[in-house]
């Protein structure tokens, strides 16, 4: 999401400020991937000690008419519009392929994409896994996005690892496979 927003901001000549309460020491020393690409597109990053949900509430009350606040992970109802388009494209593709059944998997941070995709594609099964937090966290996020809908993606529990921080066990396995 960060990189996509940085591209849109650059294209539209908008200012893009990214608030976070943590940046791994690895990313601070050597920004790479989406972070480096977003910074290169002009994204400003602000490290804050304030909890992000409290900061978002404060920022939301002081927004000017030409400003937009996007929650971490896009966890807000406006995200459903884009997912409706994605669902239509998936539905069209499935019809072209003559698929009556389809299982869709996507990893989740806040679970927003998986939730709205399952809501839009009730005829298919959407699977997700918790990349941060727990399966219970994802269910809480789903409830916050739409308290009236109980159509949730199927959550496949997962161990999670801190973003941009190498996990020694996985890195060792990667090295062994690379040799």
Give the role of each language-model region.
Residues 124-179:
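Active-site/ligand-binding loops adjacent to catalytic centers
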Residues 3-50, 119, 136-149:
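Active-site-proximal loop->helix
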Residues 22-97, 154-178:
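Small/polar-residue-rich loop-to-helix segments that shape phosphate-bearing ligand pockets
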Residues 68, 103-104:
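Structural motif
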Residues 1-5, 109-117:
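Short glycine/serine/threonine-rich phosphate/pyrophosphate-binding segments
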Residues 20-22, 106-108, 128-130:
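Short beta-strand/turn micro-motifs composed of small residues
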Residues 1, 12, 84-89, 93-99, ...:
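Catalytic phosphate/metal-binding cores of nucleic-acid and nucleotide-processing enzymes, i.e., regions
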């Amino acid at each position: 999401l960060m990189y996509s927003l940085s591209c849109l901001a650059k294209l539209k000549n908008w200012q893009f400020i990214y608030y976070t309460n943590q940046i791994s020491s690895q990313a601070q020393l050597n920004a790479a991937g989406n972070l480096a690409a977003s910074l290169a597109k002009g994204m400003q990053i602000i490290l804050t000690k304030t909890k992000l949900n409290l900061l978002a509430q404060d920022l939301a009350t002081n927004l000017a008419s030409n400003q937009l606040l996007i929650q971490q992970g896009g966890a807000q109802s406006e995200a459903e519009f884009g997912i409706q388009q994605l669902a239509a494209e998936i539905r069209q593709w499935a019809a072209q392929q003559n698929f009556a059944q389809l299982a869709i998997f996507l990893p989740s941070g806040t679970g927003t994409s998986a939730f709205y995709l399952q809501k839009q594609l009730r005829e298919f099964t959407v699977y997700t896994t918790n990349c941060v937090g727990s399966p219970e966290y994802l269910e809480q996020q789903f409830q916050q996005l739409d308290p009236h809908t109980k159509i949730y993606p199927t959550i496949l529990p997962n161990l999670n690892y801190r973003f941009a921080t190498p996990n020694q066990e996985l890195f060792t396995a990667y090295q062994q496979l690379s040799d």
